[in-house]
A protein has these predicted regions:
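The feature marks the mature, well-folded catalytic cores of soluble enzymes
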Residues: 2-316
C-alpha cells in the first residue's frame, strides 16, 4: 500500500488506495470464422431459441467489428472458411486447444456440432501444426483455458473429466478440473475470463455461482485476488471476454464488470455481439487463441496454407 499521511480532520493516519498495477498489452494470434451460415436451427444451450429469427447480416457486421478491433489493437487474425450446415462454426474457440504449435482437436458433445472438430483440424494440418485427434469429448478453448502455466478445464455440461486426462497427456501441462453447475454457463469461458495468463502474475475474473462449491474453493486457493463478477453481468455473458493483458473486449451490457476492470487497471473495450448471443456466444466464443508460452514457441508454424489464407483480411 502507498505511504500514509496524517488526516488533519481526525488525527489518524489516512491510507491512500493502492494504485492498480501498470498493465501491458501483448500482441496475440487468433483464428476466427466469419458467420456466413449463422442461424439458430436447433437448441443445445439455454440461450438458443429456434423460433426466434436471426439476422445474418447483423451477425456478420458485429463479427466484422470484433475482427477489425483485434487488428486495430495490433493482433494477428487468421481466418478459417465457414462451412454450410455448420452454423455454430463462428464460435471458433470451441474448435481446438492450441499451445506452442501443438493442437488437440475438439470432439463435440452434440451431434449437431461434430463436423466442426475435423474442419478445424484440417486447417491446422494445412498450416503445419502438430495435431492430435481427441478420443474423449472436449470442446476446445470453450472449456480449456491456459492460466499461469496451468490448464483450467471445465466439466459438467460438455467436456468430460476423461478428456482432461487426455489433454494433460497431449500437452504435458497440469490440468485443474472445475465443475460447472449452471446450464447458462455451459462452457468454462462463459463463467471465467483470463485477464492475464502470464506465469507469475496470472489473474482471472469469474462468477462463483457457476461453479460447484468445491471448485469455488479451488479457485479461491489458486487465485485469492481474483475479480468476482455479479449475476447480472455474468448473465449478459460479460465473462465471455478476451484480454490481451490490458484491453478487455467485453459485452456492453456488463457495466459493473467494466467498472471493476478499470479499478484493476485494465481498459475494457465494449463490443456488441448481441446477434451472435442468440447462439450462446460472445467475443471469446468467436476467438480461438493460438497460444504460446515462450518467445521461441511456434504460434503459427506456417503462415500460408494451400488456399493462402487471408490473414487480417476479412472485408465484406
Amino acid at each position: 500500500m502507498a505511504p500514509s499521511e496524517d488526516d488533519p480532520g481526525t488525527g489518524r493516519r489516512a491510507h491512500r488506495r493502492s494504485e492498480p498495477p501498470v498493465r501491458t498489452a501483448t500482441a496475440r494470434h487468433y483464428l476466427m470464422c466469419r458467420p456466413e451460415h449463422f442461424t439458430v436451427s436447433y437448441e443445445i444451450n439455454p440461450w438458443m431459441d429456434a423460433n426466434l429469427p436471426t439476422d445474418r447480416d447483423l451477425a456478420v457486421a458485429q463479427w466484422q467489428g470484433l475482427h477489425d478491433l483485434y487488428v486495430s489493437l495490433g493482433h494477428t487474425v487468421e481466418l478459417i472458411d465457414p462451412i454450410p450446415d455448420l452454423p455454430d462454426m463462428v464460435f471458433a474457440a470451441n474448435g481446438a486447444t492450441v499451445l506452442d504449435g501443438v493442437v488437440h482437436s475438439a470432439h463435440f458433445h452434440h451431434e449437431e456440432r461434430r463436423g466442426e472438430g475435423p474442419a478445424y483440424l484440417r486447417w491446422f494440418e494445412a498450416h503445419g501444426y502438430t495435431t492430435h485427434v481427441a478420443t474423449e469429448v472436449n470442446e476446445g478453448q470453450g472449456d480449456i483455458l491456459l492460466v499461469g502455466g496451468l490448464l483450467l478445464a471445465g466439466t459438467g455440461f460438455r467436456t468430460t473429466l476423461t478428456a482432461h486426462a487426455e489433454l494433460q497427456e497431449v500437452l504435458g501441462r497440469a490440468v485443474v478440473s472445475l465443475s460447472l453447475v449452471d446450464p447458462h454457463f455451459y462452457h468454462l469461458d462463459t463463467a471465467l475470463t483470463v485477464l492475464d495468463g502470464s506465469e507469475g502474475r496470472a489473474e482471472i475474473a469469474y462468477f462463483p455461482a457457476a461453479f460447484s462449491p468445491g471448485s469455488q474453493r479451488v479457485l479461491r486457493r489458486l487465485f485469492p485476488d481474483a475479480l468476482t463478477v455479479g449475476a447480472d453481468d455474468a448473465r449478459a455473458l460479460g465473462l465471455n471476454a478476451v484480454s490481451d493483458g490490458l484491453h478487455v473486449v467485453v459485452s456492453p451490457q456488463a457495466v459493473t464488470y467494466q467498472a471493476q476492470l478499470r479499478e484493476r487497471g485494465f481498459d475494457p473495450v465494449p463490443v456488441d455481439t448481441s446477434e451472435l448471443l442468440k447462439g450462446g456466444g460472445g467475443a471469446k466464443c468467436c476467438t480461438l487463441e493460438l497460444c504460446t508460452t515462450s518467445p521461441g514457441a511456434a504460434a503459427a508454424p506456417s503462415t500460408a496454407g494451400p488456399d493462402d489464407d487471408h490473414r487480417n483480411d476479412a472485408a465484406a
